[in-house]
Curated annotation (Swiss-Prot):
Residues 18-121, 252-276, 329-429, 447-470 are annotated as: Disordered. The keyword Translocase does not apply. It comes from Candida tropicalis (strain ATCC MYA-3404 / T1). Plays a role in mitotic spindle pole body organization, possibly at the point of spindle pole body separation. Required for mitotic exit. It is found in: Cytoplasm, Cytoskeleton, Microtubule organizing center, Spindle pole body. Residues 50-59, 94-119, 330-353, 361-389 have a biased composition (Polar residues). GO terms for cellular component: cytoplasm; mitotic spindle pole body. The keyword Cytoplasm applies. Keywords: Cytoplasm, Cytoskeleton. Residues 38-48, 63-72, 412-422, 461-470 have a biased composition (Basic and acidic residues). This is Spindle pole body protein CSA6.
Length: 506
């Protein structure tokens, strides 16, 4: 304590000290350097009550001063008495040795003795006050430092909180980063797959473009082929028209020029002539009926005006011929025995077609000329495989190739019109279908009959005669009669690769 006091005294000077900044919340207790608190009031009370009069040089006792008594005046008795103003003593500079200074003070006439110190030196009192002031400054500084420390602690706590929040944000962002990295990996995989698909689609597009190019080239080639086929078709049409004109010219030459207006007249022939023809040529009546049906079919298809009474009459004749069902086999020695046994031997109504114009019968061939045709000229008769479109356009019945189709379907041919369509008038379309179906096997029968009746020798001689005539004559249409009846010339029948039968079949 003495050393500290000496150090303080050495640093002491007479300069005025700076004012002490005391905070507002300053209390009477001060914090010391050794963390011990001192209450100034208690300390001063203890010092007053118990004085230390020991001769210790380390703890000098304070000097007690006695105040001089003052006389009270009469006029100031009622008022408050103020202390006298005494001049302040200047603080003299102390000696270097504190103990010597104390001894000087004690050896002075007014200094206190061992246990009684009536008066205290002003310098010592000032020193104590200075120590007190220094303690106060020290405590104030400590208080300020504590205040600053508290602020710094608060800031540290806030910073710690922010740090904790930042660490939590960091962890959260880390998890988000992990998730985003996973998403990035997935997106990279998808990108790789999409690139693969894009490459595949590009390859497909290239292949499709190649196919398109091939199809375009194929389309061009097909277009060229189509143009060539169209040109060839036009040439064939021109050729067909030429042959059709030639065919029509031949037909006009063979037709009777004295034909009357376009009417199909069906007349009943004389019975005596019919019996003579039947006795001489049994197939002639059937051929005449076939030719009449041909002409009638052509007239219907060319949309000429045909009276319904004549048509009904012809249908009636055909139905009577079928309904009689007279199929008597002829003698084996007879030359004109038919191939099929369904040839009707009943009375057949003949047809007079002399007044039919050439436009209504372009495919007309005389019935008398069909017996004397050669093998080449006989090809003009339509066969079963290639029927004529103007004559044999009806479909074949289901039982057509039976042994006897008429006998297998008697009800189909003999049924009445009321049972067939339930109407009061004739159905021309159904009647014509039946006529065409019946006409189909009639023509085949006549053709087979003619092949059987004509001997091979006669057919060969006829073929040779026709070939000689063809070589002798030019390759132009003469259409001269081959026999007693009118017929087509071989040039018209076999001109280049085109024949009349082929034309009719088309």
């Amino acid at each position: 304590m003495a050393d500290a006091t000496e150090d303080i005294l050495r640093r002491f000077d007479c300069k005025a000290s700076s004012p002490i900044k005391v905070p507002n919340n300053l209390s009477q207790s001060y914090q010391m350097a050794d963390d011990s608190s001192i209450d100034l009031r208690d300390y001063m009370d203890r010092q007053k009550s118990s004085r230390n009069y020991s001769d210790s040089e380390y703890t000098p006792s304070p000097i007690k001063r006695e105040k001089p008594e003052t006389k009270q005046s009469a006029h100031l008795s009622t008022t408050t008495r103020l202390p006298p103003i005494s001049p302040k003593k200047l603080f003299a500079s102390p000696t270097k040795n504190y103990s010597q200074h104390v001894m000087q003070e004690r050896s002075a006439p007014n200094s206190p003795q061992k246990k009684s110190l009536p008066n205290e030196n002003d310098d010592l009192k000032n020193l104590r006050l200075e120590m007190k002031r220094l303690k106060q400054e020290y405590n104030v500084k400590i208080e300020n430092l504590n205040y600053k420390l508290n602020l710094i602690t608060k800031e540290r706590d806030e910073i710690m909180k922010e740090n904790i929040e930042l660490t939590s944000d960091k962890s959260r962002l880390k998890t988000q980063n992990d998730l985003l990295s996973v998403d990035n990996d997935n997106l990279l995989k998808r990108k790789f797959e999409s690139e693969k698909q894009l490459k595949n689609s590009e390859m497909k597009i290239l292949s499709l473009e190649d196919k398109v190019e091939k199809l375009v080239s194929l389309n061009k080639s097909v277009t060229v082929k189509n143009m060539t086929m169209k040109q060839s078709l036009e040439g064939i049409q021109v050729k067909l028209k030429k042959y059709y004109d030639l065919y029509k010219e031949c037909q006009e030459k063979h037709n009777n020029p004295q034909d009357s207006p376009p009417k199909v007249k069906i007349a009943t022939p004389d019975p005596e002539v019919e019996t003579q023809n039947k006795a001489l040529q049994p197939q002639l009546q059937i051929q005449e009926l076939v030719q009449a049906l041909k002409n009638l079919t052509i007239a219907i298809e060319s949309k000429n005006d045909i009276p319904s009474s004549e048509l009904h009459y012809l249908v009636k004749i055909l139905k009577e011929l079928i309904a009689k069902d007279i199929f008597r086999p002829s003698s084996p020695n007879h030359q004109t025995q038919p191939v099929f046994q369904s040839t009707p031997q009943s009375k057949v109504e003949s047809v007079n077609l002399e007044n039919v114009p050439p436009e209504s019968q372009p495919s007309h061939v005389s019935s008398n000329s069909q017996q004397n045709l050669s093998d080449k000229s006989r090809t003009s008769i339509p066969s079963r495989d290639n029927p004529s479109p103007n004559v044999l356009r009806a479909e074949e019945p289901q039982d057509f190739h039976n042994a006897n189709p008429i006998q297998s379907q008697p009800k189909e041919w003999t049924r009445e019109r009321e049972e067939r369509d339930g109407s009061t008038g004739y159905s021309i379309r159904s009647d014509m279908a039946e006529i065409k179906e019946f006409l189909k096997f009639l023509v085949d029968g006549v053709k087979n009959d003619q092949k059987d009746t004509n001997s091979p020798e006669e057919s060969n001689t006829d073929g040779k005669e026709e070939e000689e005539k063809v070589h002798i004559e030019d390759k132009s249409c003469h259409c001269k009669p081959v026999s007693n009846h009118a017929a087509f010339c071989p040039v018209c029948l076999n001109r280049e690769d085109f024949t009349v039968s082929h034309f009719l079949s088309q």
